[in-house]
From Swiss-Prot:
Keywords per UniProt: Heme, Iron, Membrane, Metal-binding, Monooxygenase, Oxidoreductase, Transmembrane, Transmembrane helix
Organism annotation: Arabidopsis thaliana (Mouse-ear cress)
GO cellular component, as recorded: membrane
InterPro entries in UniProt: Cyt_P450, Cyt_P450_CS, Cyt_P450_E_grp-I, Cyt_P450_sf, Cytochrome_P450_71
An annotated Gene Ontology molecular function: oxidoreductase activity, acting on paired donors, with incorporation or reduction of molecular oxygen
EC annotation from Swiss-Prot or TrEMBL: 1.14.-.-
Gene3D superfamilies associated with the record: Cytochrome P450
The keyword RNA-binding appears for this protein: no
Taxonomy of the source species: Eukaryota, Viridiplantae, Streptophyta, Embryophyta, Tracheophyta
Pfam families per UniProt: p450
Transmembrane region(s): 3-23
Name of the protein in its database record: Cytochrome P450 71B5
Length: 498
């Protein structure tokens, strides 16, 4: 009843806001008519990307919807995405501010959600220099290979001790990805002193609240409803847990004297924080450190593990592809290898096609991080005013029959002699985005995915648990911002005999 009264009180304010938003200076995109106050929010189901996909089938690849009183442009075509991310990259490379993104990035002191400007440029410079440069990628190679060997040992132990028992691949793969990201970013392997189930819970809870829609984001005085509904309290609890975890990691660096060795991003930034700053120069603070930790920890851990799990899921559903892939891998690498190295990644072309096909059907973030126009622009013949939010639906683009034959089927061979790849130059496939706001950790992320999958597919043969068929594999999704497989993938590993 109290929430209903809030809506009644907000109605006059909402009507005033609607009159001021999106002044008509030209032809606006089409879209479904919304309701007072809530706009089109009532048309969204559990998964926003699927709801927008369905609406786009009626209204086209460039639509105008209202999230509450906030106008949002939805782009669902390769051509529209190219205009936003390439033609008008500079004019659209800022970010809208939301409650969740502001909180979990410590007031936008990160790279991913920071509005375009000095803070974003400086933070990106630090991240690229200390984490994502080619030099750093090579220097961290031993960490990735160490963890891939540990992954193989864990699965081997299970295969030998309980030959007919299944392995929960979500847990195994999450630990693999989290261990790599935490070692190369934070200089610590949390497996040694933190329960990985707790870490997984923390990542999922933080990401869910980061990607959740708050009433305050889309309604004037919506913060009142957030507090009455309990949304504000839920988000704050998740944020508090994440902050406590980060402070534990930072305190460990301070106690162990790691600041001086500059071996990881935390020690580098702590040194920057402690050094005197010249007048007029950029000042790095504790919030900048935590903001960057949030980006790396949440996006780095979850996106990589989710892609690996969806890939193994599709391979399990398509035994022909699994057989073909494993035959190619083993023929290319030869028998009885003791370990997989990153040189081996250049020998397995079909694996790269399989991963690209998984990206097409299961992009980790089916809606790219929203952009905000910094000037009036024109997209596909429609006028888009300054300060308008733009969402690009890569889920729809990846299933567009104009770009893909049999778009709903898992067919890695579609990438044979096909120039399309995932690095941001081809707008049919955008798992990492494109333009100035492309994911800076793309090379690191894809290397982790390829190395982990290659290790699992070279050393083990995989089968479904007894009595289960490919039709029984559950494909239900879960998540808010990053979309994971809801039901854990359970497979039976058998050490391959040569």
């Amino acid at each position: 009843m109290s929430i209903f009264l809030c809506f009644l009180l907000l109605l006059p304010l909402s009507l005033i806001f609607l009159k001021k938003l999106l002044p008509s200076k030209g032809k606006l995109p089409p879209g479904p008519k919304g309701l007072p106050i809530i706009g089109n929010l009532h048309q969204f189901g559990r998964f926003l990307h699927k709801s927008l996909h369905k609406i786009s089938q009626e209204y086209g690849p460039v639509m105008l919807l209202h999230f509450g009183v906030v106008p949002v442009i939805i782009v669902s075509s390769k051509e529209g995405a190219e205009e936003v991310l390439k033609t008008h990259d500079l004019e659209t490379c800022s970010r809208p501010k939301t409650v969740g993104s502001g909180l979990f990035t410590y007031n936008f002191k990160d790279i991913g959600f920071a509005p375009y400007g000095e803070n974003w440029r400086e933070m990106r410079k630090i991240a690229v220099s200390e984490l994502f440069s080619q030099k750093k990628l090579k220097s961290f190679r031993y960490i990735r290979e160490d963890e891939s060997q540990l992954l193989v040992r864990k699965v081997s132990k299970s295969a030998l001790e309980t030959p007919t028992s299944s392995v929960n691949l979500r847990k195994v793969i999450f630990t693999f990805a989290a261990s790599i990201i935490c070692r190369l970013s934070f200089g610590q392997n949390f497996c040694d002193f933190v329960d990985m189930e707790t870490v997984e819970e923390l990542v999922l809870e933080s990401e869910t609240n980061l990607g959740s829609l708050a009433f305050a984001d889309f309604l004037p005085a919506g913060w009142i409803i957030d507090r009455i509904s309990g949304q504000h309290s839920t988000v704050m609890k998740a944020f508090s847990k994440l902050t406590n975890f980060f402070e534990l990691v930072i305190d460990d660096h301070l106690k162990s004297g790691k600041i001086e060795d500059h071996s990881d991003i935390i020690s580098v930034m702590l040194d920057m924080i402690n050094k005197p700053t010249e007048v007029g120069s950029y000042k790095v603070t504790d919030d900048h450190l935590k903001g960057l930790m949030s980006d790396v920890f949440l996006a780095g851990v979850n996106a990589g593990s989710i892609t690996m799990i969806w890939t193994m899921t599709e391979l399990s559903r398509h035994p022909r592809v699994m057989r073909k892939l494993q035959e190619e891998i083993r023929a290319a690498l030869g028998p009885n290898k003791e370990k997989i190295t990153e040189e081996d990644l250049e020998k397995v072309e079909y694996l790269k096609m399989v991963i690209e096909e998984a990206f097409r059907l299961h992009p980790p973030a089916p809606l790219l991080l929203p952009r905000l126009t910094m000037s009036d622009i024109n997209i596909q013949g429609y006028s888009i005013p300054k300060n308008t939010m733009i969402q690009i639906n890569t889920y729809t683009i990846g299933r567009d029959p104009k770009n893909w034959t049999k778009p709903d089927e898992f067919i890695p061979e579609r990438f044979v002699d096909n120039p399309i790849e995932y690095k941001g130059q081809h707008f049919e496939l955008l798992p990492f985005g494109a333009g100035r706001r492309v994911c800076p950790g793309m090379a690191t992320g894809i290397t982790i995915v390829e190395l982990g999958l290659l290790s699992l597919l070279y050393f083990f043969d995989w089968s479904l648990p007894n009595g289960m068929t490919t039709k029984d594999i559950d494909m239900e999704e879960d998540g808010a911002f990053v979309i994971a497989k809801k039901v854990s993938l359970e497979l039976v590993p058998t050490l391959h005999r040569w």
